[in-house]
């Protein structure tokens, strides 16, 4: 047996590193959300699954954070349920008080309004008032979008993870809004490969895991508290399609991030050239790292107030597109006065507007964030 309790393990534990002779492991009191290589899952074309244990584990003690994991732990439990129920396999998980209890697949949704929304739209997952993460979504529900609006009056989004990170949910859109003046809470969420649209507004979120979000191309993060990192580098779509697609305001790549006081870094896909229809960053007082230099095409660019310590390096625009070929294609640019006062901004305007023939920037006065005002950079 191996005791790794209180060992400072972070988000992922990889069972492939364990020696073959290890049959018991204690992972309690660690912040582990992902349990890689615990089981091998093979999914057939008809959706049938074959699950195999990768290790001969007969004792597994888990931290509270394990409750969010479905892809590995739920399948491990389902595969070994008879052994767990019969007592030949010992699997426990800590509760919110740190007490280890026998593992089960029932999960709470504390907010009554969120529970009502989920029951109305994703009833297949419920067992009474609890979500049973071992249940499958039927064909009618597995592709439904998630859209929790202000009118739904949700203040605690905990429990939504059990749908969004469910391998049987194939929805492409996740939109969560909290009423202005309220602060919705969501400690951790991981989204999957089918998601293309992610909109979060007015939520306090500690950990947003986008490592599997390779289909993501529209992201809006508005009034988000606590979040330090926004990493969309795993997307194989954002900024990587043709100029005709990326220049289309309906389907082009889109990133809007403002009034996120704790956000320190934004990471784009690491590609030589990126194209997008819309990029807006405003009022990010903690921003340290955001590299836009590999963006070569933008339909609209909005830069609001950013910390003076942040080195603002503008995109190197070489591609311009307008579906109306009778109109000279440009990038529409909006900035705040503080942004305009930066040397890099004035150099950007000189390059693409004042010294360009034809001019490649066009002016629009309004910034989106209510805490910013657009500045007339053409005067």
Predicted features and spans:
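Conserved hydrophobic position(s) of the canonical leucine-rich repeat
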Residues: 1, 10, 21-22, 57, ...
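Conserved hydrophobic beta-strand positions in leucine-rich repeat
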Residues: 2-4, 23-27, 60, 144-147, ...
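Short, T/G/N/S-enriched strand-turn elements that build extracellular solenoid repeat scaffolds
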Residues: 12-17, 35-40, 71-72, 128-135, ...
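Ankyrin-repeat and related helical/solenoid repeat scaffolds used for protein-protein interactions
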Residues: 5-64, 269-336
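Right-handed parallel beta-helix
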Residues: 178-217, 222-223
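Conserved "Asn-ladder"/turn position within leucine-rich repeats
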Residues: 7, 30, 65-66, 151-152, ...
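Intrinsically disordered, low-complexity Ser/Thr- and acidic-rich flexible linkers and loops
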Residues: 43-51, 237-249
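N-terminal capping/linker segments that flank leucine-rich repeat
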Residues: 31, 42-43, 47-49, 53-178, ...
């Amino acid at each position: 047996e191996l005791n790794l309790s209180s060992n400072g393990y972070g988000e992922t534990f990889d069972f492939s590193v364990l020696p073959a002779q290890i049959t018991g492991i204690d992972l309690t009191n660690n912040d582990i959300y992902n349990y890689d290589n615990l089981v091998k899952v093979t999914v057939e074309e008809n959706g049938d699954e074959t699950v195999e244990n990768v290790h001969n584990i007969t004792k597994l003690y888990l931290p509270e954070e394990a409750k969010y994991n479905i892809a590995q732990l739920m399948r491990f439990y389902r595969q070994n349920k008879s052994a767990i129920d019969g007592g030949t396999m010992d699997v426990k998980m800590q509760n919110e008080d740190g007490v280890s209890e026998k593992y089960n697949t029932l999960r709470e949704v504390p907010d009554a309004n969120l529970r009502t929304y989920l029951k109305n739209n994703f009833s297949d997952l419920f067992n009474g008032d609890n979500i049973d993460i071992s249940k499958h979504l039927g064909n009618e529900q597995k592709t439904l979008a998630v859209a929790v609006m202000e009118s739904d009056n949700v203040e605690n989004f905990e429990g939504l993870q059990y749908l969004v990170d469910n391998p049987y949910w194939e929805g492409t859109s996740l939109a969560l809004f909290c009423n202005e003046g309220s602060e919705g809470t969501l400690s951790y969420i991981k989204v999957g490969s089918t998601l293309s649209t992610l909109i979060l507004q007015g939520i306090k979120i500690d950990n947003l895991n986008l490592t599997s979000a390779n289909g993501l191309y529209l992201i809006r993060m508005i009034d988000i508290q606590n979040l330090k990192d926004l990493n969309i580098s795993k997307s194989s779509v954002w900024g990587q399609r043709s100029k005709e697609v990326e220049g289309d305001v309906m389907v082009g790549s889109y990133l809007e991030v403002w009034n996120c006081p704790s956000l320190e870094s934004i990471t784009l896909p690491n590609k030589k050239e990126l194209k997008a229809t819309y990029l807006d960053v405003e009022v990010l007082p903690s921003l340290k790292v955001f590299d836009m230099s590999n963006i070569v095409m933008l339909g609209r660019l909005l830069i609001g107030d950013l910390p003076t310590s942040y080195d603002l390096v503008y995109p190197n625009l070489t591609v311009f597109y307008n579906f109306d070929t009778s109109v000279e294609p440009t990038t529409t640019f909006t900035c705040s006065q503080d942004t305009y006062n930066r040397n890099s901004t004035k150099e950007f305007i000189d390059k693409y507007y004042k010294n360009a023939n034809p001019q490649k920037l066009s002016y629009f006065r309004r910034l989106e964030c209510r805490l910013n005002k657009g500045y007339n950079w053409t005067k």
